[in-house]
C-alpha cells in the first residue's frame, strides 16, 4: 500500500475503476463511493468502529465487493493549515493499513467538509437523529467529490474517447 498525490492517482487509475472516500472518526468511518465514470460521489452506510483489525476487515470487504481501486481519506487539518492529533491518527490509520492492503490512499484536505455536509442535510430537512447517523458518510461524500473534481480538472478521462 502506498500513499499517492491526486496527480499520481490520476495517472495510475484505469478507465472504469471506482474510488472510495473515507471520513475517519473515533466512533465511525464515513464511506462514500464514486461511480465508474468517477464523476459523482454517493454516501454509503458508515462503518461502526470497534478495533483496528475489525475496522480494516470491514473496510477491505467493502472495497473488494465494490471493486475499489483506491481510497481518498480526509485529512483533518486545522483551519490555519497546521496539523494536530486527528491528522496524526489519520496518518497512523493509513500506515496500519499498509500491512493489510496494496490499495493506494490519497490524503485530501477535509477542512469544512463536515460543515458542508451538515448544511446539505439541513437543507434537505433531515431530522436531527438522521443527521447524526448520516453526517460522516455525507462528509466522506464531500471529501470524495472534491477529489473527483480535481481528477476531472487534471483532464484524465475516466473512459477513453471511443471516437479516436
From Swiss-Prot:
Its EC number is 3.1.-.-. Transmembrane segments: none annotated. GO terms for biological process: rRNA 5'-end processing. Could be a nuclease involved in processing of the 5'-end of pre-16S rRNA. GO terms for cellular component: cytosol. Its main location: cytoplasm. CDD domains: YqgF (cd16964). Belongs to the YqgF nuclease family. Keywords: Cytoplasm, Hydrolase, Nuclease, Ribosome biogenesis. It comes from Rhizobium rhizogenes (strain K84 / ATCC BAA-868) (Agrobacterium radiobacter). One of its GO terms (molecular function) is nuclease activity. It holds the Pfam family RuvX. It comes from the Bacteria. It is found in: Cytoplasm. Signal peptide: none annotated. This is Putative pre-16S rRNA nuclease.
Amino acid at each position: 500500500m502506498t500513499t499517492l498525490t491526486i496527480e499520481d492517482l490520476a495517472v495510475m487509475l484505469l478507465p472504469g475503476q471506482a474510488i472510495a472516500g473515507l471520513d475517519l472518526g473515533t466512533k465511525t468511518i464515513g464511506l462514500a463511493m464514486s461511480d465508474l465514470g468517477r464523476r459523482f460521489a454517493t454516501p454509503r452506510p458508515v462503518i461502526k468502529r470497534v478495533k483496528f483489525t475489525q475496522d480494516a476487515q470491514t473496510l477491505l470487504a467493502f472495497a473488494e465487493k465494490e471493486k475499489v481501486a483506491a481510497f481518498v481519506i480526509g485529512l483533518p487539518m486545522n483551519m490555519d493549515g497546521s496539523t494536530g492529533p486527528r491528522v496524526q491518527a489519520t496518518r497512523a490509520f493509513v500506515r496500519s493499513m499498509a500491512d493489510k492492503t496494496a490499495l493506494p490512499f490519497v490524503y485530501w484536505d477535509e477542512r469544512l467538509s463536515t460543515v458542508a455536509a451538515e448544511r446539505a442535510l439541513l437543507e434537505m430537512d433531515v431530522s436531527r437523529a438522521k443527521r447524526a447517523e448520516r453526517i460522516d458518510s455525507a462528509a466522506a461524500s464531500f471529501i470524495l467529490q472534491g477529489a473527483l473534481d480535481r481528477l476531472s480538472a487534471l483532464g484524465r478521462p475516466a473512459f477513453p474517447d471511443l471516437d479516436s
